[in-house]
Amino acid sequence: MPVKIIALAEGALTGFTDEIFDLPHTLAARDLFIDVPGEETELLGTLAKLYKTYIIVQCKARWPEVMDDRYFNTLFVIDPQGEVVHKAAKNHLWCRERSCTPHDIYDRWVECFGEGIEAFYPVLKTDDIGNIGTICCSDGEYPEAVRALTFNGAEVVYRPSEAVPMTNSGSSPGGSWMVQNRGHAEFNSVYMLCPNVGPVYLSPSSRFPMDISGGNSHIVSYRGEIMSHSTSSNNTAVSAVIDIEGLRQFRAVNLNSNWLKDLRTELFKDMYRQPIHPKNLWLKDDPAHHNEVDDVYRSNIESLYQRGTWTRPHNSFDGARLFPEGDPGTNAQKWQDIRQMWAVWNED
């Protein structure tokens, strides 16, 4: 049986150096990351043509058509002709990620792409392998992300990678990551393609990798069933048959567990009128370092207490801070120091 979709894990193309070392955003955009399309996608396009397959990939990429000196956690699809036919940006970040998001420059993003859901969660519609939506890692912590793709027509959702402890929490293989992806599939009647990254090297010259992900790559059917799963945290492959016609028949005739058909949308329309995380944070300023972004998250938590959404614990404190007060954070010189240290660490 021919392979029609190959899905790579997050980090396979551009890694995680920016977030591990809290690099200045502009420096990382210029020094580390890529353009889509670009020379990397040309190489992948050659492979797509050779094997007559679609390739789905995550990377950190610049979007110069939107804003200079910004990079986004980017999902893209290459078709069997070797062309980039889909590109989307991650909207929800892990608290240590340094990427910009469409929400962080909301006004500019709307100016470029419009303000509909399709501007933030686009779906690639094909004649041969169904409709593909793409999110990444932390995006999948929010049920709304996959629901948005579903409303836009998605039948297959690519959600690469998650990290420890989410992949090994609880007693079941795959931890809460597996639970989330089975839930996404069941609630929305979509396939979930969920490859996880293998061991990560901090630099091209590193001798030893780190296991940050915990493995557990898997594919889930539109009924929420695990079709293929590997518990390994090494570089692995999982595979399954994606039956788009079966999914479409299920949606057409099932009156019991085809949930989207009778969603009472009017009941929920007021839930999101009041914002939680502020938009346009980095419209004028460079995306901030970890310690500054932590203060934004703490402010969001306080707002949920103030509006009565959450109840405060009996004992409460701010928690550990990333840097002591007065620490200037990471800068361009420290980045050069890090690069020199890599060379020293790996000398024979």
List the predicted regions and their residue ranges.
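N-terminal active-site segment of His-dependent metallophosphoesterases
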Residues: 1-5, 14, 158
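Short beta-strand segments at enzyme active-site cores
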Residues: 2-10, 54-59, 193-194
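Metal-dependent catalytic neighborhoods of phosphoester/phosphodiester hydrolases
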Residues: 12-29, 67-71
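Feature marks short, surface-exposed loop/turn motifs that line or immediately flank catalytic pockets
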Residues: 12-15, 165, 246
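Active-site catalytic loop in hydrolytic enzyme cores
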Residues: 33, 42, 46, 62-183, ...
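CN hydrolase (nitrilase-like) catalytic-core segments centered on the catalytic cysteine
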Residues: 33-56, 131, 136-239, 341-347
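Short beta-strand scaffold segments in enzyme catalytic cores
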Residues: 57-58, 73-77, 122-124, 217-219, ...
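C-terminal beta-strand edge segments of enzyme domains
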Residues: 187-191, 196-348
